[in-house]
Design a protein with these regions (language model features):
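Phosphate-binding glycine-rich loops and adjacent basic patches that engage nucleotide phosphates
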Residues: 6-9, 50-57
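Extended, low-complexity, intrinsically disordered C-terminal regulatory tails
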Residues: 23-54, 130, 138-140
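Active-site acidic/histidine clusters and adjacent loop/turn architecture
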Residues: 1-33, 116
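Catalytic cores and adjacent binding grooves of peptidoglycan-active enzymes
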Residues: 59-162
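Alpha-helix initiation and capping sites
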Residues: 13-20, 38-41, 66
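Intrinsically disordered, low-complexity boundary segments flanking structured domains
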Residues: 19-23, 34, 55-61, 125
Length: 162
């Protein structure tokens, strides 16, 4: 059984009840961190300017309060004591840093991260179904189970479909 750390607990407090229910259930069986829930206008504008998000304030699911979206990241167990940082969303520099720190190839780091992400996503999907909450993930915006047709991938992103 796992539990949320201080930062994840703070993020949890910004989430809508449906997301709280799902993450509270999921943490019982799978270890992950919550990176961000509610996003204020300044942060949303900054992310939009950097191309981190495609949605302007106030139209993002992170912009509601409580938030209808959360960014999550799995604890990558095969990377020894190195925890995938909250800043890692597939940025090449961070993949390179993890490869260097672990002595693994960048390709292997990606394989490990994507394997853990898929496991985490499956756990979240299962608890979404159990609790009757429809979710959308940042690797499959149109929810057709074809990740190759996406023009923007945001692996950490999970949102409630309303």
């Amino acid at each position: 059984m796992f539990s949320f750390g201080r930062k994840s607990s703070e993020v949890r407090e910004t989430l809508c009840d449906e997301l709280k229910l799902i993450v509270d259930s999921a943490i019982q069986v799978y270890n992950f961190s919550m990176i961000e829930g509610h996003r204020d206008q300044e942060t949303q504008d900054r992310y939009f300017a950097k191309g981190v998000t495609k949605v302007k304030w106030p139209n993002g699911k992170h912009n509601t309060y409580p938030s209808d979206a959360v960014d999550l990241w799995p604890y990558v167990t095969n990377l020894a004591d190195i925890r995938v940082s909250s800043a890692l969303s597939g940025h090449p520099d961070q993949i390179k840093a993890l490869a260097k720190a672990t002595g693994k190839t960048e390709k292997r780091i990606w394989e490990l991260v994507l394997q853990e992400y898929a496991t985490m996503k499956g756990v979240l999907m299962a608890f979404g179904k159990v609790h009757g909450v429809e979710l959308r993930f940042g690797d499959d915006w149109d929810r057709d189970h074809d990740r190759l047709d996406q023009s923007f991938i945001d692996l950490p992103h999970v949102e409630v479909v309303r």
